[in-house]
Amino acid sequence: MRVLGIETSCDETGIAVYDDDKGLLSHTLYSQVKLHADYGGVVPELASRDHVRKIVPLIRQALADADMTIEDIDGIAYTKGPGLIGALLVGACVGRALAFSWDKPAIGVHHMEGHLLAPMLEDDVPEFPFLALLVSGGHSMLVGVEGIGRYEVLGESVDDAAGEAFDKTAKLMGLDYPGGPRLSKLAAKGVANSYRFPRPMTDKPGLNFSFSGLKTFAANTIAAEPNDEQTRANIACAFEEAVVDTLAIKCKRALKQTGYQRLVIAGGVSANTRLRAQLAEMMTNLGGKVFYPRGEFCTDNGAMIAYAGLQRLKAGQTDDLGVKGQPRWPLDTLEPVD
């Protein structure tokens, strides 16, 4: 089965073709980073309009790269939510139109399920069950995964997501958008333990996260300290250490609670070098193993949507002809794939 995947949940237009037997045949991606840089963040209306401009040329490119036409495609998967409603509707409209015009089955995919399953695009794939740490600009959650669609949200952020905290702290430091990766680059020049930031909610039972207070602590530290490059690097390093330590502590707690031996990390923040290294060391010490997608599949992309959609289309799941987007969509409400 060959599936065309369409991702338009935020500020990346991602298109891919995935074959059940041959794997990923093609994927194309257009990032709107330059478009939104002057505004310091994503402007929803501009994002939607740019998806409209880019989506059809990217679909043509992905099909050409796979040496296919739409007639060679067996199904279509598009991101249904969560995300920006205008951006979601662009992908949903195009996906549904192609499905209707060419009489193909189509399915709306949960964006975070796409991230959760992104490591399945690699050669070394995790077996079920496993613990998933999903960390991005909009989400931070720990999920117990027994199978596709069999998810239990064990913990999540009660305020800012980890990626959001990275971006907001970077903005406080005067770093250009997108701030998260720039903050991490600056942190690499910092001296470890120069500052001691709190590890939020790690002294309390439970698996939820809270990063808004950490952002406030960073703001106060930035305001109180000199503005030279080394001090800024030290503050960035301390902030990153605090976020990574917090995520690692919660992961270890969740692994103990569930008894799982495999950990998946996915989402934009999963590309963070310090996070990957610390969780890999932790899993080695625990006798387990960590899995994550390659860097290009940590951020939003069409490949993960094509893969996730294929699993559901193979199981006979499809959506009706309605064009729908779900800006909010709890992950644990998804239908299992038997």
UniProtKB/Swiss-Prot annotation:
Fe cation binds at H111, H115, D300. It is an enzyme of class 2 (transferase). Substrate binds at L134, V135, S136, G137, G138, D167, G180, N272. NCBIfam families: gcp_kae1 (TIGR00329), T6A_TsaD_YgjD (TIGR03723). One of its GO terms (molecular function) is iron ion binding. Its main location: cytoplasm. It is found in: Cytoplasm. HAMAP family: TsaD (MF_01445). Required for the formation of a threonylcarbamoyl group on adenosine at position 37 (t(6)A37) in tRNAs that read codons beginning with adenine. Is involved in the transfer of the threonylcarbamoyl moiety of threonylcarbamoyl-AMP (TC-AMP) to the N6 group of A37, together with TsaE and TsaB. TsaD likely plays a direct catalytic role in this reaction. Its EC number is 2.3.1.234. Binds 1 Fe(2+) ion per subunit. PROSITE patterns: GLYCOPROTEASE (PS01016). This is tRNA N6-adenosine threonylcarbamoyltransferase. Belongs to the KAE1 / TsaD family. PANTHER family: TRNA N6-ADENOSINE THREONYLCARBAMOYLTRANSFERASE, TRNA N6-ADENOSINE THREONYLCARBAMOYLTRANSFERASE, MITOCHONDRIAL. GO terms for biological process: tRNA threonylcarbamoyladenosine modification. Keywords: Acyltransferase, Cytoplasm, Iron, Metal-binding, Transferase, tRNA processing. Its cofactor is Fe(2+). InterPro entries: ATPase_NBD, Gcp-like_dom, KAE1/TsaD, Peptidase_M22_CS, TsaD.
